[in-house]
Amino acid sequence: MSSPDAGYASDDQSQTQSALPAVMAGLGPCPWAESLSPIGDMKVKGEAPANSGAPAGAAGRAKGESRIRRPMNAFMVWAKDERKRLAQQNPDLHNAELSKMLGKSWKALTLAEKRPFVEEAERLRVQHMQDHPNYKYRPRRRKQVKRLKRVEGGFLHGLAEPQAAALGPEGGRVAMDGLGLQFPEQGFPAGPPLLPPHMGGHYRDCQSLGAPPLDGYPLPTPDTSPLDGVDPDPAFFAAPMPGDCPAAGTYSYAQVSDYAGPPEPPAGPMHPRLGPEPAGPSIPGLLAPPSALHVYYGAMGSPGAGGGRGFQMQPQHQHQHQHQHHPPGPGQPSPPPEALPCRDGTDPSQPAELLGEVDRTEFEQYLHFVCKPEMGLPYQGHDSGVNLPDSHGAISSVVSDASSAVYYCNYPDV
């Protein structure tokens, strides 16, 4: 069944073909006029195979003549006729199977049976040397198609890894689900935020005071943490000593007085006994940062202080000076309050105000306070019978102020 427009299409085509030579004749001889006509198109198509076939055959013959084959060895001489015989006997076998059978048969032959073929191969080799004295064996290069296939395979394999990485978290979620592991949600870290090693223990110790746990909460904003700008000196975030930050409950001095401390150290040049004391050091000397000897022996018990005995509240005073030695810089944010040890909050630049706030009635009570045995200081109980003269009023006031600062730190509700 033909379409109704078929006749029209054929008429238009015939009219165009008949009008084309007239138009070309009016235009005159043009180099491209013959190619536009159907006759010229047929001529070009007919001449192309003829012209292309002749050079192709000549090039093939020249290529075949330029390529020199290697002389056959003894096995090739024997297999040339034997392959034809096996192919006639087994027409259905593949050439690879025939090659396997020929190899087994050649190995099964004895040297006497191989000798005529070896002699024939030697003759062909000598003849080949005479015919082609400058012959040099050049092995064939592998086809570029195989090499391109290998390259494309490796290229596609290399592209598979970026595609797998481009899957994003969804691909990771599928992989984690397949392994039976839990995939973390976006926007939250997979684990608790890391803290410096010298701060992790202090946070864990101070959580017993009732502060909320800090390890499970991420930062609310992408800004830097306030802890990043703090001086990482361990002296600033020193581990709390036993008694600096009590866990809970009220602190009673009766329990401290019942504590059986270590025996009193022997008398010597470094640990003198009780005796007449010289005039005490000045107030700026007590409020200044302690030296190495002051830290170990105390301001009153060090050899440089006159050889006097050390009083009991000196460890607290040393601890306060250590915290005052590393204040946060002006551009650094203050650390969280629960991360700080108990600070006295006193300013050494105002000794007059400190002396005015001291209650002299509390001084004798704090003198009987037991010192820490781990600090290596002399141990004095409440029954040691220590009597200080009234001439040491300034020293007593400073010590009492330091003790009251520690006392009010231990009692935040007072």
UniProtKB/Swiss-Prot annotation:
The Gene Ontology CC terms held by the record are:
chromatin; nucleoplasm; nucleus; transcription regulator complex
- On the tree of life, the source organism's domain of life is Eukaryota
Q: Name one Pfam family in it.
A: Sox17_18_mid
Composition bias, Low complexity: 47-61
Stored PROSITE patterns: HMG_BOX_2, SOX_C
| DNA-binding residues (ranges) | 68-136
Domain Sox C-terminal, first and last residues per copy:
280-413
Query: What is this protein's function per UniProt?
Result: Acts as a transcription regulator that binds target promoter DNA and bends the DNA. Binds to the sequences 5'-AACAAT-'3 or 5'-AACAAAG-3'. Modulates transcriptional regulation via WNT3A. Inhibits Wnt signaling. Promotes degradation of activated CTNNB1. Plays a key role in the regulation of embryonic development. Required for normal development of the definitive gut endoderm. Required for normal looping of the embryonic heart tube. Plays an important role in embryonic and postnatal vascular development, including development of arteries.
Disorder named in the UniProt entry: Vesicoureteral reflux 3: A disease belonging to the group of congenital anomalies of the kidney and urinary tract. It is characterized by the reflux of urine from the bladder into the ureters and sometimes into the kidneys, and is a risk factor for urinary tract infections. Primary disease results from a developmental defect of the ureterovesical junction. In combination with intrarenal reflux, the resulting inflammatory reaction may result in renal injury or scarring, also called reflux nephropathy.
Could you identify this protein by its name?
Answer: Transcription factor SOX-17
What is the organism of origin for this protein?
Homo sapiens
